[in-house]
Amino acid sequence: MMSYIKQPHYAVNGLTLAGTGMDLLHSAVGYPTNPRKQRRERTTFTRAQLDILESLFAKTRYPDIFMREEVALKINLPESRVQVWFKNRRAKCRQQQQQSTGQAKPRPAKKKTSPARETNSEASTNGQYSPPPPGTAVTPSSSASATVSIWSPASISPIPDPLSAVTNPCMQRSTGYPMTYSQAPAYTQSYGGSSSYFTGLDCGSYLSPMHPQLSAPGATLSPIATPTMGSHLSQSPASLSAQGYGAASLGFTSVDCLDYKDQTASWKLNFNATDCLDYKDQSSWKFQVL
């Protein structure tokens, strides 16, 4: 009998059932009655209330709770409304500052572009001024000093590389020997005597001024050495015709050297393996520099 009485609480439309499922069911049924929050009414401030709030905002933008409560009592509004008003007022102030800075930004941008233009103009002027220094560096005085340093007795004569390939040591040049360059006639200057130019130097023996390729007969001389040799050998046409020299070619072998011994009479060309050039008369020499 008692068991029969206990059973009905399972069959009364589920209202007397106990469990988490029924609790969730009841809670879910309660939500549709109030689906969203009620909207708060907008607060309309009078002019007197705004004056009081603005005066406090001028003093401090972040009033503490005591200041807000005091102002709320003055304007007959709750403290929460005063707090929201200060929050909105600070946001409005930040927005105004951003707008003012946004309007002021183009002006500094223009100021920034003007230095960029100035730097571009300076770069262009620098580009205009950069070419003249190399051009001005090439002056007759500087070129003359360069030639003096090149043709100094202690320096080596600038002979091309093909002419320096010589097997015989007597054909190698030990000191500088001036030659005439036809490409720079504007800077050529003739020096009468060599005794003052080559001071303190033993000019008794000068090596050959030419180093042609001696491997093949008839090797052509360089344009630098050919006119110089022609000028020196013009005093002995008989020896030239006897040896069969052309205008720009020589026929002696790799062991031949030139020997200039007699400076007054006609020069003779002896092609011996052990002889080298001897320049004894130095007063008749003429040197031309670039």
Curated annotation (Swiss-Prot):
InterPro entries tied to this protein: HD, Homeobox_CS, Homeodomain-like_sf, Otx_TF, Otx_TF_C
PROSITE patterns: HOMEOBOX_1, HOMEOBOX_2
Listed GO biological process terms: anterior/posterior pattern specification; eye photoreceptor cell fate commitment; positive regulation of transcription by RNA polymerase II; regulation of transcription by RNA polymerase II
GO MF term list: DNA-binding transcription factor activity, RNA polymerase II-specific; RNA polymerase II cis-regulatory region sequence-specific DNA binding
Sections of the chain in a coiled coil: none
Pfam families in the record: Homeodomain, TF_Otx
GO cellular component: nucleus
Tissue expression pattern: Initially expressed in the Spemann organizer of early gastrula embryos. Expression in the organizer begins to decrease during late gastrulation and has disappeared by stage 11.5. Expression then persists and intensifies in the anterior neuroectoderm. Exhibits a dynamic expression pattern during neurulation and by neural tube closure (stage 20), expression is restricted to the cement gland anlage and epiphysis (pineal gland) anlagen. During tailbud stages, expression in the cement gland decreases and from stage 24, expression appears in the neural retina.
Keywords, ordered alphabetically: Developmental protein, Differentiation, DNA-binding, Homeobox, Nucleus, Transcription, Transcription regulation
Entry keyword annotation includes Cell cycle: no
Polar residues composition-biased segments: 94-103, 116-129
UniProt-listed SUPFAM superfamilies: Homeodomain-like
Domain of life: Eukaryota
Residue ranges flagged as DNA-binding region: 38-97
Subcellular location: Nucleus
Region (Disordered), start-end ranges: 93-142
Keyword Nucleotide-binding listed: no
Main localisation: nucleus
PANTHER family linked: CONE-ROD HOMEOBOX PROTEIN (PTHR45793:SF22), HOMEOBOX PROTEIN (PTHR45793)
Record's function text: Transcription factor involved in anterior and eye development. Promotes the differentiation of both rod and cone photoreceptors cells in the retina. Together with other retinal homeobox proteins, acts as an effector of a cellular clock which, depending on cell cycle progression, establishes the generation of distinct retinal neuronal cell types. Acts synergistically with nrl to activate the rhodopsin promoter. Promotes the formation of anterior regions and represses the formation of posterior structures during development.
Protein name: Homeobox protein otx5-B
